[in-house]
UniProtKB/Swiss-Prot annotation:
InterPro entries named among the record's database cross-references: Aminotrans_II_pyridoxalP_BS (IPR001917), Aminotransferase_I/II_large (IPR004839), HisP_aminotrans (IPR005861), HistidinolP_aminotransfase (IPR050106), PyrdxlP-dep_Trfase (IPR015424), PyrdxlP-dep_Trfase_major (IPR015421), PyrdxlP-dep_Trfase_small (IPR015422)
EC main group: transferase
GO aspect biological process, one term: L-histidine biosynthetic process
Lineage: Bacteria, Bacillati, Bacillota, Bacilli, Bacillales
Pathway: Amino-acid biosynthesis; L-histidine biosynthesis; L-histidine from 5-phospho-alpha-D-ribose 1-diphosphate: step 7/9
Subunit annotation: Homodimer.
Protein name as catalogued: Histidinol-phosphate aminotransferase
C-alpha cells in the first residue's frame, strides 16, 4: 500500500437534506446550495437526448467520445486530436497527474483552491508547493517564483474555487511568458461560462503562443450535467497522445456523450441561464455587507468570516444548505427566492 495515502482522506460529502433536518430540527424544505450545481438544470434538449437513447444502455460507450470530440472541436475551433475527455474534471486531473508525475516531482499551485490538484500529486509521491492566496485570488507573482526547471506541473484555477476570484488576460499572459516552456501550466476554467468580466483571459488565443498552456473545462457547472460527469482538457497533440494511454477505455458513458452534445448545441439556453446567474449574483453585492464578500465571477459567493459555522447554521435555518470553510462560507447562487432569503440573513449577520 502506498504510504503517502496516510496523508490523505477520502472525500467526505455533506449531510443529506433529510439528515440535516433531523440533526437541526428543521421543518420545511431544504435547498442544496453547497456544491455549485446549476439549479436551473441542463438544457431540455439534453434531457431529450438522454430519453432518446435509453435503449442503448446495454452498449459500451464509444471509446474516446468521438462525436463529442468533433462537436467540441468545432465549437472551440481546435483540432480534435488536442482534446481528451474524462468523467468530470476530477478524472482529467487524475489522468494528467498519473501520466506526468513521478516520485519527487514538484507541482506548484495555490492554497485555498480546488483540492484535487494536491490530492492527486500526493498519490503520485510528488511534492506540493502551495502559495498563499492574495486577496482571495491566485498570487501569480509569487507562484512564478516557485516555478523552476524541476517543476512538473503548475495548476491554476480561474475563476478560483472556492473563492470565485479571477486573474485577467494580461496577468496570465505575463505569467506564461516567464514559465519555462517545458513546464505544463494547467488552467482550470470550470466556471468559464459564468464569467462576465471583459478582461478575462482568452486562453485558447494564448495557446497559439504558448504550447505549455493547457485548458480544462467541464459540463458539470453552467451546462448542468454534474450527474453525468463530462470534463475535458485542450492541450497539444503530443500531450493528449500520452495522456490518452492513461484514460480508461470507456470512461465517459454513451448517455453522457449524447447529453453533452445536445447541451453544447443549445447555446441559447446556456446564455439564458448564465444571464440569470449574473443578475442574481449582482444582488448579493448590492448590500453594504458585501464588503465581507470576495468578488465573484462564478455561480457562487464566498463570504469571509471567522464565524463560518454560525453563518452556515443561520443560512440553514432559512432552508439553505451552504458550504462552510475555515475562513468563510461558500454560497451557491440559487433561484431568486432562495437568494433573497440568504441575503436577508447576510444583512443582519455579525461578521
Amino acid at each position: 500500500m502506498k504510504q503517502q495515502l496516510n496523508q490523505l482522506a477520502a472525500y467526505q460529502p455533506g449531510l443529506s437534506p433529510q439528515a440535516l433536518k433531523e440533526k437541526h430540527g428543521i421543518e420545511g424544505e431544504l435547498y442544496k446550495l453547497a456544491s455549485n450545481e446549476n439549479l436551473y438544470g441542463p438544457s431540455p434538449k439534453a434531457k431529450q437526448a438522454v430519453q432518446a437513447h435509453l435503449d442503448e444502455l446495454f452498449y459500451y460507450p464509444e471509446t474516446g467520445s468521438p462525436s463529442l470530440r468533433k462537436a467540441i472541436s468545432e465549437h472551440l475551433n481546435v483540432d480534435p486530436s488536442r482534446i481528451l475527455f474524462g468523467a468530470g474534471l476530477d478524472e482529467v486531473i487524475l489522468m494528467i497527474s498519473r501520466a506526468v508525475l513521478t516520485p519527487g516531482d514538484k507541482i506548484v499551485t495555490s492554497e485555498g483552491t480546488f483540492g484535487q490538484y494536491y490530492h492527486n500529486a500526493i498519490v503520485e509521491s510528488a511534492e506540493v508547493v502551495q502559495v498563499p492566496l492574495l486577496n482571495g485570488g491566485f498570487d501569480l507573482e509569487n507562484i512564478i517564483k516557485e516555478v523552476d526547471e524541476e517543476t512538473a506541473l503548475v495548476w491554476l484555477c480561474n475563476p478560483n474555487n472556492p473563492t470565485g476570484t479571477y486573474f485577467n488576460h494580461d496577468e496570465l499572459e505575463s505569467f506564461l511568458e516567464r514559465v519555462p516552456s517545458h513546464v505544463p501550466v494547467l488552467i482550470d476554467e470550470a466556471y468559464f461560462e459564468f464569467v462576465t468580466a471583459e478582461d478575462y483571459p482568452d486562453t485558447l488565443k494564448l495557446q497559439e503562443r504558448f504550447d505549455n498552456a493547457f485548458l480544462l473545462r467541464t459540463f458539470s457547472k453552467a451546462y448542468g450535467l454534474a450527474g453525468l460527469r463530462v470534463g475535458y482538457v485542450v492541450a497539444t497533440n503530443e500531450a493528449i497522445e500520452k495522456w490518452n494511454i492513461i484514460r480508461p477505455p470507456f470512461n465517459v458513458t454513451r448517455i453522457s456523450e449524447y447529453a453533452a452534445i445536445a447541451a453544447l448545441e443549445d447555446q441559447a439556453y446556456l446564455k439564458d441561464v448564465t444571464a440569470k446567474n449574473a443578475k442574481e449574483r449582482e444582488k448579493f453585492f448590492e448590500i453594504p455587507q458585501s464588503e465581507h464578500f470576495l468578488p465573484s465571477q462564478t455561480n457562487f459567493v464566498f463570504v469571509v468570516t471567522e464565524k463560518a459555522q454560525e453563518l452556515y447554521e443561520a443560512l440553514l435555518k432559512v432552508g439553505c444548505i451552504t458550504r462552510p470553510f475555515p475562513t468563510g462560507v461558500r454560497i451557491t447562487i440559487g433561484f431568486p427566492e432562495q437568494n433573497d432569503r440568504m441575503i436577508e440573513v447576510l444583512k443582519h449577520f455579525d461578521y
